[in-house]
Amino acid sequence: MPEKHNAERRERYTKAVEQLGNASAPVRLGGVYTLVSLVDEWLREENIEYNERIAEGQVIINILCAYIRSPFALTSHYDELTQDSPTAEGLYKNREQEFYIDKAEFKSEADIRLSILKEIHRRLQGPDENTPGAWSDFEYDFSGSIFFYPVDLTRSYYAKPVNFSGSAYWDEADFSYSTYMDEVYFSESSYQGRAGFNGSIYQGEAVFRGSTYRGSAGFARSTYRGGAYFTGSTYLSEAVFRGSVYRCAAAFNNSAYQYWVDLRGSTYQGAADFGGSTYQYWADFRGSTYRRWAYFNDSICCGWAGLSHSVYEGEADFSGSVFCGALNFGTDFFGKPFPSRFVQNAPCFVAENDALATLFGSSSNNFVVEDSGYPVSLGANGLPLGCGF
């Protein structure tokens, strides 16, 4: 009897995969729901070992992920097809009937892909917060996808690796309050709308390198137990990382922040690298703790830089940077005294190997630090020794 059921499932699987290639959207959607049901059935099958059930289900998960990754020609007309009517100078000028045909096809395909994500999402959520769902033991590969529809994968639990690298999000994308028990890749991706990763837990490496965020980017109150890598990213709107904990290396180097960035109240237990970055507006690092090295070298900060109320237990390197606005170690945003403390070393403002000094564009800096730590030695110009305007 089990063999008969398994054979029937494979027949249904074959037919459902064929349906995914059908020209009719309802037929394709029917194939999706058949595949989803088959995964659930395999997981409920008690006559085979759990690992075998997972293996059978993984085959179907791979098909569903491949459908999400597959190209869709009309995405190149996204800007026009998301309008209510043809634009005056667009591709569909004087082609109104074709516009509405393509718009209907565009919406149908978006609905199919949204349905896949919703079914996966629902099964990645356990009964309680931060607990696995029925599909949490599968691996997911969405790399290189174009998400031309909103993505909601909040409160998801992934027990295995997950890959979103090289993807493009043309609407909002929210991954907040999720748990990743293995590595996760969001690198080389672009976000046209708001991107949310707040309140998440990363047990393995979290890789966000080389990404571009055109809308607001939220990573607040997250915990990274493996390395966290944001190197080479560009933020065109506000970026919020405040209240996070990094237990291993945290790399934000060689990034560009076109608006303000908030990294307040964070703890870095490994090396923290912000070097080689550009801050066009204000950068707020206040109230943070650095257990090892902290690199802010070779950066440009065009606005106010807040580094007060923080503890630096290892080396802190600011050499070769340019602070056009005020640099503040001593007070909060409103002028109340909250000096930082340098526990083992005075902060470095001049690189020893090449004598590259930090430059300042403001005379309103505050270099007051706690007496219980190392001081910032100032020259006659009121700047750290070796530095200038």
Residue ranges and their predicted role:
Residues M1-E11:
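Membrane-embedded hydrophobic alpha-helical segments
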Residues R10-E18, A23-L29, Y33, E41-Y78, ...:
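N-terminal leader/targeting and pre-domain segments
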